[in-house]
Curated annotation (Swiss-Prot):
Gene encoding the protein: rps8
Protein name as annotated: Small ribosomal subunit protein uS8
InterPro entries: Ribosomal_uS8, Ribosomal_uS8_CS, Ribosomal_uS8_sf
Subunit structure as annotated in this protein's UniProt entry: Part of the 30S ribosomal subunit.
Example GO BP: translation
Record-linked PROSITE patterns: RIBOSOMAL_S8
């Protein structure tokens, strides 16, 4: 069996583990995109440390959960967003203005929608977390 969207599967698994009160989530398969999304989430205080574990296949991320995530998920389809259009997607995916993050893939790498707005960049929506 193959996964159609490993990022959506990983974020759903993290959200479910957080919901039942687990302190650690094991995300597999690991990928560079999932690692970069976890890095943004860690920088903004939604998860604790995470580490890559080699298992001889695709690898596993061990993610420490700290009880800060209410919901997280992947955005499908991955909308192309101009720098002026972030507010429309904030209203769609986040519960309130200034609460939560949209994670955006820009030409300068993965970053939050606020960082992209400040730098005047557009990109593709990857995921949300609040």
């Amino acid at each position: 069996m193959s996964l159609m969207d490993p990022l959506a599967n990983a974020l759903n698994h993290i959200s479910n583990c957080e919901g039942v009160g687990k302190s650690v989530a094991y995300v597999k398969p690991a990928s560079k995109l999932i690692g970069r999304v976890l890095n943004v989430m860690q920088d903004h205080g939604y998860i604790g440390n995470f580490e890559y574990i080699e298992d001889g296949r695709a690898g596993i991320y061990k993610v420490e959960l700290i009880g800060q995530i209410n919901k997280c998920g992947a955005v499908k389809p991955r909308y192309a967003v101009k720098k002026q259009e972030f507010e429309k997607f904030e209203k769609r995916y986040l519960p309130a203005k200034g609460f939560g993050l949209l994670i955006v893939s820009t030409p300068k790498g993965l970053m939050t929608h606020d960082e992209a707005k400040n730098q005047g960049l557009g990109g593709r929506l990857i995921s949300y977390v609040f």
